[in-house]
Amino acid sequence: MGGCLSGDVKGGKQAIGGVQQRPTSSTIANNAAHNDAVDFFFRSRGQYPLFSQIELTLSASNLLDCDITSKSDPMAVMYLRKKDGRLEEIGRTEVILNNLNPKWIEKITVSFQFEAVQTLVFHVYDVDTRYHNVPVKTLKLKDQDFLGEGTCVLSEIMTRQNRTLTLTLTGNVRAGVNRNLGTLSIQAEETVASKTVAEINFRCVNLDNKDLFSKSDPFLRISRVVETSAAVPICRTEVVDNNLNPMWRPVCLTMQQFGSKDTPLVIECLDFNTSGNHELIGKTEKSVAELERLCLQKEAANFVYPSLSHGRNKVLKGQLIVDRYVEKVQYSFLDYISSGFELNFMVAVDFTASNGDPRTPSSLHYIDPSGRLNSYQQAIMEVGEVIQFYDSDKRFPAWGFGGRTSDGSVSHAFNLNGASYGDEVVGVEGIMVAYASALRNVSLAGPTLFSNVVDKAAHTASQSLSQNSPKYFVLLIITDGVLTDMAGTVDALVRASDLPLSVLIVGVGNTDFKQMEMLDADNGRRLESSTGRIATRDIVQFVPMKDIHSGLVSVVQALLEELPGQFLTYVRSRKINPIGAPAI
């Protein structure tokens, strides 16, 4: 999620680059078959995924003594609980002999995924003396004495300031269910590789001209070669207008993006087109190690153009030059979160008449007596259940828009809980209760306006910013309709782009959501207000429910994939460090 690009963007072409934009097709035509958020999720979850690696160190205190002539010989096993309830073993510690207060040395590594609720289950065993010379990975757990179990969510550990969580062990053991089974402590540490970045200054010379009446408008797209599928885009530069010898601002590639310094990277130079069909100028394949050598040896790499007849690629006169290569460590998303930064959740629900009468099963707002969630409930639950772990008080502002309230007027930002003052509810369950209550007390009306709820969220973020609060706000808008106030919404989003705020939009139903794709800046352009102001950064992420691939990826996974990157773009552009951390 790296990206050294910073500063105000003066135009749509320049706004294509920056912190890891959503990927486009690797073909020259650059056509996209699915929503960008969903595409990005699938492509980044290939053989070499892009998440932070976390090392967990375990220790225990006051374990149960199951041995007669000595103390227990404990070993810990960690599992990840899957959605269907199955336990997937992630790793085991070593066995420590004759010790009821073990401090295991063997670390267990797990990949942190912000967009998922990762439930960890820990089992502690007393390993029988007969198996002390057997490798721990081959031990049959059914042959060992069970000492207790602990469960937590990985984000619970990562949000602690010292990244340490202590669990009370429970479970049915032979000594009885009510006996004190001791505690298990988990300490998490993000690997250095997750924070290491390569900062690179690129320029090109002698590029081929692809335009008739002017020079090309080139930018670079860098992709990682993946063995099992097409290359995965990981970074783009800004566009340089009308220039065949362009020089770009520095880009940052994180080690978690490129895997290792020897991993092949495809570097494409493309001519920007406003249609989104960017034309390939040339490409080259280099690893990070090779880019470093180009810089040290002051050499250049020639671009090639793919042969349409599958023959030899055409070598071009255009060259890629690396003017500067520096490796450094940056603070990660988890550094900020564990230091005390919070993500504050807000939600806005569409109460326009196009949703259909909530009393009929065909309505998008229908509350099924069987407990089956409608699309609005599903989006609230999935997004809220992830973000709630990053909010200490779990008090969430919840609004509705496009509904006729009890006073007979249509409101585009009414409190979902029905209160005249105070828009907060407690927990995700509180949002669900307030939503169901509002359906009974608010009449569906219209039109569909976003600007009011965006302004309310921006006001909250602005107040927090003025108080120097370490908070970042996430507004979830769930809608079924076509926007009536497109210009007003764009203006509100451009104003909000300066604030610690991201806007997640879920489209429900079968409406044409082309407008939402425009808000999501999927063509590489940042939003431009009615007065000509360009958004400081892209703060919108959109996904339609119907575009989720056969249930293989949830709404929350597609929506939240880029949120840590948006957060980092904000804090890094303002040179904000984790609480108590020195500048680096």
Swiss-Prot record:
Family membership: Belongs to the copine family.
Limits of the VWFA domain: 344-563
Main location: membrane
Residues the entry annotates as binding Ca(2+) 1: 67, 73, 126, 128
Location(s), subcellular: Cell membrane
Its membrane topology: Lipid-anchor
One of the protein's GO biological processes: defense response
One term under GO cellular component: plasma membrane
Statement: the UniProt record of this protein carries the keyword Membrane: yes
Gene that encodes the chain: BON3
Molecular-function annotations in GO: calcium-dependent phospholipid binding; metal ion binding
Required cofactor(s): Ca(2+)
Gene null: resulting phenotype: No visible phenotype; due to partial redundancy with BON1 and BON2. Bon2 and bon3 double mutant has no visible phenotype. bon1 and bon3 double mutant is seedling-lethal when grown at 22 degrees Celsius. Bon1, bon2 and bon3 triple mutant is seedling-lethal at any temperature.
Reported function: Negative regulator of cell death and defense responses. Repress a number of R genes and may have effects in promoting growth and development. May function in membrane trafficking and in fusion of vesicles with plasma membrane.
Record bears the keyword RNA-binding: no
Quaternary structure and partners: Interacts with BAP1 and BAP2.
Gene3D superfamilies to which the protein is assigned, alphabetical: C2 domain
Protein name: Protein BONZAI 3
Organism: Arabidopsis thaliana
Keywords, ordered alphabetically: Calcium, Cell membrane, Lipoprotein, Membrane, Metal-binding, Myristate, Plant defense, Repeat
Binding site for Ca(2+) 2: 67, 126, 128, 145
Region of interest (Disordered), residue spans: 1-23
C2 domain mapped to chain residues: 34-167, 178-305
Pfam family, one: Copine
InterPro entries documented for this protein: C2_dom (IPR000008), C2_domain_sf (IPR035892), C2B_Copine (IPR037768), Copine (IPR045052), Copine_C (IPR010734), VWF_A (IPR002035), vWFA_dom_sf (IPR036465)
Covalent lipid sites (N-myristoyl glycine): 2
Tissue expression pattern: Expressed at an extremely low level.
